[in-house]
Design a protein with these regions (language model features):
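Catalytic domains of carbohydrate-active enzymes, especially glycoside hydrolases
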Residues: 14-41, 127-132
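Aromatic-lined substrate-binding rim segments of carbohydrate-active enzymes
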Residues: 20-21, 37-91, 200-208
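Short, acidic/polar
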Residues: 9-25, 113-125, 229-240
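The substrate-binding groove and active-site-proximal loops of carbohydrate-active enzymes
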Residues: 2-12, 38-54, 100-119, 181-198, ...
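Active-site beta-loop-alpha junctions enriched in small/polar residues
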Residues: 7-11, 37-39, 76-80, 138-140, ...
Length: 244
């Protein structure tokens, strides 16, 4: 069983942190130290966050590998949590089903350009060969004020599967209704949002697999609330071939 201990990439206190990690694993408090990173995009073009943070990770890896201590990475943000980026990005943000407003704190997981970006971030991380990589609970979309995502990418996929074109406003009304047609579109919307998240996670996994397919993938969640959205699907997609 994994017993993960979250650690900061604080190079100013590297000696104390490394000593703490070694002691934790020696005494059975934890099995792995998980260093926090954030890959949610910022800037146009997007800043290479993975490379910047992995340079700090390298300093810890060198010391921990010599001691035999095990370590991995918690990617604390991929789509984005609740914080507005310091610099705007060029990817598609999520769009509210209710009113059509963009919410820039979260990227749309169906945007093909975002998927290319996030896959490359995980490929760069995999070059450091962490034993475990964990995704944080910002993968969900339905628990957010947007009630999923009704951007151009999601609406196009809904219309493709339905075989007819409807607007965001019509989709919203269907999600409020109780007819058979309403239920069809509400279920279709859930399916499309779920698949967009899962396929985005698969892109992240592909980034790892291009370098090191043995890395154990883990998905976190707060299982007493709504933050476990589709985590059974995403955990399977991210675990890696042959991993639990």
């Amino acid at each position: 069983m994994l017993n993960l201990s979250i650690m900061p990439l604080d190079t100013e206190h590297i000696d104390e942190i490394v000593a703490d990690i070694i002691e934790q694993q020696k005494t059975g408090v934890s099995t792995h130290a998980m260093f926090m990173m954030e890959f949610n995009p910022e800037g146009t073009p997007a800043v290479n966050k993975a490379e910047m943070q992995c340079k700090k990770y390298d300093l810890f890896r060198e010391r921990l590998d010599k001691s035999g201590a095990r370590h991995g990475v918690l990617v604390q943000a991929t789509l984005g949590h609740i914080y507005t980026p310091y610099e705007p990005y060029s990817f598609q943000p999520t769009v509210s089903l209710n009113n059509g407003e963009e919410r820039v704190v979260t990227c749309c997981p169906l945007d093909p350009d975002f998927r290319k970006y996030i896959k490359e971030q995980f490929r760069i991380l995999a070059e450091r060969h962490p034993a475990v990589v964990m995704l944080d609970d910002d993968l969900g979309l339905f628990y957010r004020p947007t009630n999923g995502c009704a951007c151009k990418h999601h609406m196009a996929e809904i219309n493709r599967r339905a075989g007819k074109a409807i607007t965001r406003e019509e989709l919203y009304q269907h999600c409020l209704g109780d007819t058979e047609e309403d239920k069809y579109y509400a279920d279709l919307y859930v399916d499309v949002v779920r698949d967009s998240i899962v396929d985005c996670v698969k892109a992240m996994r592909e980034g790892l697999d291009e370098v090191d397919p043995t890395i154990q993938g883990v998905v976190s969640g707060i299982y007493t609330s709504t933050f476990c959205e589709f985590s059974d699907y995403t955990a399977e997609a991210f675990a890696g071939k042959g991993n639990p």
